[in-house]
Amino acid sequence: MANTLNLGNGNWATKEDSLLAYNSENGNYKPLPFDFTRASSATVVNKDGLIETVGSGEARIDFSNDAKGALLLEPSRSNYIPYSTLDFDGGVKPNGWSIGFGIGSYSYEQLTYKGQKAVKQTQITTGRSYLDTGSITILANTEHTLKIQFILNECVADANDNILSFISFGAFAIYKFSDIDSNGVLEIQFNPLSDNVGSLRIGLGVDQNATGSKSLAWAIPQLEQGSYATSYIPTSGSAVTRVADICNNAGNEQVINSTEGVLYAEISALANDGTERYV
């Protein structure tokens, strides 16, 4: 039987605190002695490309990179942006965010991206506006990563348009539309050396007027402590922590013959950051 069991390879089944293996010989699933734990909910990209939330203790099968899927195991992280869900709740802007300047004719509207709420700013006439997170407190002298997904087919902007600024955090930094990669991702690593309190401003008018008929659309903003970005953590009023995924007790005599056997695994690291990894 061991030669016919596949964990993954496009065939996944999960239940609370465990994974199931697919038996390609008879087309059903068999339990394996994997112990899986995570004491919090978490998000994952499903087969339809949508970001969905799974409950505490439920293994995450992520389809971000291909149709086969992969078991996603991540360290504990927190999203320090207090209102990342960008919910307008019938208003004219996302809850918890403030509009800065507000010069000229402009609008903000609710969009949807990968099953999550998004925001689109339109600068109708020449003027200036942006969305501000409000005060955020993070740990000084520690590397952090900011990741924002821009919806490129909804954006009308020039490469040199300024779209993001850090206020305080020990330094004033501005990023341009050209800093977004071809997939619409803006990912920034930074280290607040002195001041651990600041805010983020996102929009076409973060530091100067923008010409009319331009737009900027974005979603799932996340600011976390660490040298690389992890899966999205929704927040609605305060920072939220996702607890680490833990999966162990694999490859024992219940799966492999007690005297010999081979365990084959395809594994991809979340980041090449020099930390130790064990299989």
Describe each region flagged by the PLM.
Residues M1-V279:
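Extracellular and organelle-lumenal recognition/adhesion modules and their flexible linkers in secreted
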